[in-house]
Amino acid sequence: MLLSFRPDVYEKIKSGVKIFEHRRNFPDEPIMAYMYVSSPVKAITGVVYLGKRHCLSDWLEYYKEDSNAVTRIKEYMETYHYRYAMEIDRFQETSQISLDDLRKNVPGFVAPQMYIYLDGTELLEHIESNLKMTDLQVEHSFEKIEACQVCVH
């Protein structure tokens, strides 16, 4: 999978501040996704490993005693129309593959608006042969999710 991220969101994931990825729709299975960072970066420059998918509606019930958490969850649901939060188990920084490189070497490449599946594509082959892992990795544990951690970034 290739997921699209704004540069500010990418930086929050890279720094370890952001521990959940919120989306309107998302598969209910662990995902390894390459990260495409939008303008001004315009490049694939990381890998994110997403674990368990949480329904925000379930969190509303679970955290109902914490009014601040309920307010944040409702905002994510009503303002941004998010339905799910995926645990960011791990982030791996990589070298960059620029948009120009992708357009030049992968016929018909268009930067994703949200996400695209890569299984069996030329794009996946190009990414796998050109992306190099760096030393930077960030890992998170989700043994206990506190109310103060939900819907904050």
Regions found by a protein language model. Give the residues of each.
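Short polar/acidic secondary-structure junctions
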Residues: 38-40
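Short coil-to-beta transition motif at edge beta-strands of beta-rich domains
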Residues: 25-35
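Contiguous surface segments at macromolecular interaction interfaces
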Residues: 1-26, 42-45, 53-153
